[in-house]
Amino acid sequence: MPVLEHVDSLLYLGLMSGTSADGIDAALVRFAEDTHRRCELVAGTTVAWEPQLRETLVALGQGAETVAIDALGQLDAQVGLAFAAAANQLIRDSGVERRRIRAIGSHGQTIRHRPEADPAFTWQIGDASRIAEHTGITTVADFRRRDVAAGGQGAPLMPAFHLAMLGAGDQDSAVLNLGGIGNLTLIPRDGAVLGFDTGPANALLDSWCQRHHGTPFDAEGAFAASGRVDAALLQALLADPWFALPPPKSTGREQFHLDWVLQAMGSARLDAADVQATLLELTAASVADALLRLQPSTRRVLVCGGGVRNPVLLARLAARLPGVVVESSARYGLDPDYLEAMGFAWLAAELLAGRAANLPSVTGAAGPRLLGAIYPA
């Protein structure tokens, strides 16, 4: 890639690994102005986790495994080194001079998210000191815990970024991120933005596919398309009290994992493809139900995250939302594969600019807060 022409542009690098832990997304972002209301994806890459490390992270995330303090300390360092390596790879591939990148915004890897606990907590690992040390770039991390300390859920954080990039239009709209967990940003023509997790998305689909189909994800939804939705199982899954909770709410693998699915199945003997089809329908149903309940006037849903590559899921979502345009965020210049990583670059920029970046209407926090901690180069 040629040297950037806009010497007055603000370059930030965002790093993200989500609930699915399918890889580290790295995005190099140019902000056109100090207000950070417009951005351009300069370059992006996804670096796969080392398989054994991914297995450990997934098990930790769903509470299926405990780790000794020494092992957890080493895991934190390993994740930090992996994030640094992903950043360095992107910088090399992009041809951008390292000194031109003002900061890195790193989400880290969530290993536990307990906003309902007393006291509430959320925990992301990935030693930011090592990222700063191995990249030579100031790193901003630990974005969620200040919101939790202020009484919020600490999630989702992307609605503030969605609002900054898209603004309120002339009709009610929504942004749907289909990552490991689904989450919605509701942007009304007027009034406060609302954002919340909708429930499981790729995390369950990927896990079931890995166990019963031998592939890490369901390419284009083909496995789900080969099965039929089991109405009884779908009803049992949707009966989980979490779905009826009002926002603000957030969740993770601690709540929605394969043992949860197996418990709902009980003694029923179902074809693996039928379960996959049912899990896909669960994602579509939980999103559509929430949208129709909380902003029924929505006329456009922009989709991002890995689920945008699943045409079967998008078709089922559209079928449950008649009269609503369901389309990729790419239509509006926001790359669906890297939107979350771009968002964490934006969060880093907002902290360094001294601006609060949470939305209390989304997370339930007591008020606006500066998010993140700075690790100088």
UniProtKB/Swiss-Prot annotation:
SUPFAM superfamilies, from UniProt?
Answer: Actin-like ATPase domain (SSF53067)
One Gene Ontology term from the biological process aspect of the record: amino sugar metabolic process
Q: Which reaction does it catalyse?
A: 1,6-anhydro-N-acetyl-beta-muramate + ATP + H2O = N-acetyl-D-muramate 6-phosphate + ADP + H(+)
Binding site residues for ATP: G18, T19, S20, A21, D22, G23, I24, D25
Q: Gene3D superfamilies in the record, alphabetically?
A: 3.30.420.40
Matching entries from CDD domains are given as:
ASKHA_NBD_ANMK (cd24050)
Query: TM segments?
Result: none
What InterPro entries does its record include?
A: Anhydro_N_Ac-Mur_kinase (IPR005338), ATPase_NBD (IPR043129)
Keyword set includes Nucleotide-binding: yes
What's its EC?
2.7.1.170
For the protein in the UniProt heading, the enzyme class is transferase
What keyword terms does UniProt attach to this protein? ATP-binding, Carbohydrate metabolism, Kinase, Nucleotide-binding, Transferase
Pathway of this protein? Amino-sugar metabolism; 1,6-anhydro-N-acetylmuramate degradation; Cell wall biogenesis; peptidoglycan recycling
GO function term, MF aspect, one: kinase activity
The role this protein plays is: Catalyzes the specific phosphorylation of 1,6-anhydro-N-acetylmuramic acid (anhMurNAc) with the simultaneous cleavage of the 1,6-anhydro ring, generating MurNAc-6-P. Is required for the utilization of anhMurNAc either imported from the medium or derived from its own cell wall murein, and thus plays a role in cell wall recycling.
* Family listed: Belongs to the anhydro-N-acetylmuramic acid kinase family.
Please report the name of this protein according to its UniProt entry. Anhydro-N-acetylmuramic acid kinase
Organism lineage reads as: Bacteria, Pseudomonadati, Pseudomonadota, Gammaproteobacteria, Lysobacterales
The gene coding this protein = anmK
